[in-house]
Curated annotation (Swiss-Prot):
Gene Ontology MF term list: GTP binding; GTPase activity; magnesium ion binding
Enzyme class: hydrolase
Species the sequence originates in: Pectobacterium atrosepticum (strain SCRI 1043 / ATCC BAA-672) (Erwinia carotovora subsp. atroseptica)
Binding-site positions, Mg(2+): 173, 193
HAMAP family, per the entry: GTPase_Obg
Record-given protein name: GTPase Obg
Length: 390
């Protein structure tokens, strides 16, 4: 299946149903009073994280999603039916942004996590709500409000523990093939890897971690050159980055400059990638003499100002790979993933008499009071029967 990690969709929540103007009319009850019911609330739009999905390709073809409108109120104080909600399934790891404002609405990082992205409109009030001592036969109602409408940008970020960095042909895909069951394409030309891939590294029956391989970076990637800039976002959730440096580049380029290119692109990209733990791994030591490999690695580390430990490996024949993987496993155990628990603020409980409806009723009552003028003289009141007078 084609890997698609970005999509734009339009979501429209349902409008609220309108209130009804109606009066009770039955045999022997000619003036039964108002009985218009309220409308129904509009349906909401939700996103649901599903671990069985791994691409956003479905939303390249289906781009519009609309929740159901609330039904209008009816006579006999019948309330309209609430509109049905709509649920859109997305892969775990999807980031949701409002395209208009750029606001991050949420990160779908857990299976079955739900996120409301569109609130349905409020129902309108029927004329029975406006009955009062001064307005026995109200002919007012309110219409339902519009549901939320917005364009969303969905970005799929792979959930991996370890991310691979390096120029094209640094040996990233070969490494992930050597340590996991993943089989990304491997060849002797640049940009063999066109899309990210994940591999599970199993150290024993109880310990494992996930490694992500992304297309190689080139100079100017942070400005849009090459393929890597599109996929650097997949490294944002990694706990450690493995920076692979080719000790014997096929194009005879300078490994020191190659390593500096990657470091510079991380700093230019931002999003905290440059501050993440990064390990220096020298690959393809099997292509040169062992002493020469150690000499080159030492020179590169000194030129980069690298004081931490570095590794010499050959991903092709798995030389030095197992100790590296165990060190990664121990690092991950010592630095467990911090699951961000969003402390959701207590939501305002919205009943039928919410602020919107209170304002509507207050306006109508104010108008009715202004129209009602009583001079306390019963003689000029039309339609008033004097029952008793002293």
């Amino acid at each position: 299946m084609k890997f698609v990690d970005e999509a734009t969709i339009l979501i429209v929540a349902g409008d609220g149903g309108n209130g009804c103007i109606s009066f009770r009319r039955e045999k022997y009850i000619p003036n039964g009073g108002p009985d218009g019911g309220d409308g129904g609330d509009g349906g909401d739009v939700y996103l649901l994280a599903d671990e069985n999905l791994n691409t956003l390709i479905d939303y390249r073809f289906e781009k519009s999603f609309r929740a159901e409108r609330g039904q209008n109120g009816q006579s006999r104080d019948c309330t309209g039916k609430r509109g049905k909600d709509i649920t859109i399934k997305v892969p775990v790891g999807t980031r949701v942004l409002d395209q208009g404002t750029g606001e991050v609405l949420g990160d779908m990082t857990r299976h079955q996590q739900s996120l409301m992205v569109g609130k349905g409109g409020w129902h309108g009030l029927g004329n029975s709500r406006f009955k009062s001592s001064v307005n026995r036969a109200p002919r007012q109602k309110t219409n339902g409000t519009k549901g939320e409408e917005r364009e969303l940008t969905l970005e799929l970020l792979l959930l991996a523990d370890v991310g691979m960095l390096g120029l094209p042909n640094a040996g990233k895909s070969t490494f992930i093939r050597a340590v996991s069951a993943a089989k990304p394409k491997v060849a002797d030309y640049p940009f063999t890897t066109l899309v990210p891939s994940l591999g599970v590294v199993r150290m024993d029956s109880e310990q494992s971690f996930v490694v992500a391989d992304i297309p190689g970076l080139i100079e100017g990637a942070s400005d849009g050159a090459g393929l890597g800039i599109r996929f650097l976002k997949h490294l944002e959730r990694c706990r450690v980055l493995l920076h692979l440096v080719d000790l014997a580049p096929i194009d005879e380029s300078n490994p020191i400059e190659n390593a500096k290119v990657i470091i510079n692109e991380l700093e230019q990209y931002g999003a905290g990638l440059a501050e993440k733990p990064r390990w220096l791994v020298f690959n393809k030591v099997d292509l040169i003499d062992k002493a020469e490999a150690e000499k080159r690695a030492k020179e590169i580390a000194a030129a980069l100002g690298w004081d931490d430990k570095y590794y010499l490996i050959s991903a092709a024949n798995r030389e030095g790979v197992n100790p590296l993987c165990w060190d990664v496993m121990n690092f991950l155990k010592a630095n467990p993933k911090m699951m961000a628990i969003a402390e959701s603020a207590p939501e305002k409980v919205e009943f039928m008499w919410d602020d919107y409806h209170r304002e509507q009723l207050a306006e109508v009552e104010k108008e009715a009071e202004e129209e009602w003028d009583d001079d306390w003289d019963d003689e000029d009141d039309e339609g008033v029967e004097i029952i008793y007078q002293k």
